């Protein structure tokens, strides 16, 4: 048996030939797919050399078996099949996808990670190594992308960022690469999750004044994303106002 390989890995075998050229070799390939299907394919190779190359299939994950069903040369034909088989395993590439109903856009507060982490579903053989990038798209200041690798021992992971968002604006969180116990997937990753990072709601006084005249207005600066609802107490009475 040959060592297992990942899907789409180039692979071939060399068959030694004896006889008067040209020598013809009948080969039968049997594929047992991971879905339980059996596929049989026959082909004939011809060569005037002492060896002939046999391309081996790796396009579909599963177990492959090759048998030589018969040979013939310029003078003789041997229809007896070879009892020995060439066998090997083709592993599928791991896959990652966001769990169903995961919103394509979510929000997070400045200086914090997201309140509800999206769940990444993984297909393959654990453990998985997942490369994640959180990169700024449109921010209110300079921000560096965050890249990190996380090992997942199951098939689901609630994506937790290693550091909080430090700059408000729009960020994208994307899967760069997924690797399982056998293979690696660099392309065909799920679409990114867009994160709107906003300042936490707050009320800031623009001045340190403590005394005001009767009828004079007291101004405050609102932090966060409108509309704001502010509840305050003055002279023993509680009031609520909305500002847009």
Language model regions located:
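Extracellular low-complexity Ser/Thr/Asn/Gly-rich intrinsically disordered segments
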Residues: 1-244
């Amino acid at each position: 048996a040959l060592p297992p390989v990942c899907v789409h890995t180039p692979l071939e075998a060399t068959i030694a030939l004896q006889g008067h050229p040209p020598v013809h070799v009948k080969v039968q390939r049997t594929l047992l797919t991971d879905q339980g299907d059996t596929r049989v394919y026959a082909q004939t190779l011809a060569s005037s050399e002492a060896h002939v190359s046999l391309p081996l299939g790796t396009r579909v994950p599963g177990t492959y078996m090759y048998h030589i069903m018969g040979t013939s040369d310029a003078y003789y034909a041997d229809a007896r099949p070879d009892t020995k088989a060439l066998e090997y395993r083709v592993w599928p590439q791991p896959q990652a996808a966001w769990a169903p109903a995961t919103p394509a856009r979510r929000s997070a507060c400045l200086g914090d990670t997201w309140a509800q982490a999206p769940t990444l579903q993984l297909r393959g053989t654990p453990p998985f190594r997942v490369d994640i990038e959180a990169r700024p798209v449109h921010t209110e200041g300079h921000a560096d992308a965050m890249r990190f690798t996380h090992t997942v021992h199951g098939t689901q992971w609630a994506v937790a960022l290693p550091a909080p968002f430090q700059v408000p604006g729009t960020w994208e969180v994307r899967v760069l690469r997924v690797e399982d116990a056998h293979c690696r997937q660099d392309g065909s990753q799920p679409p990114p999750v867009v994160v709107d990072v906003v300042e936490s709601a707050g009320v800031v006084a623009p001045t340190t004044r403590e005394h005001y005249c009767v009828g004079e207005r007291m101004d405050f600066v609102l932090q966060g994303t409108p509309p704001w609802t502010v509840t305050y107490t003055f002279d023993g009475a509680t009031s609520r106002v909305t500002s847009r």
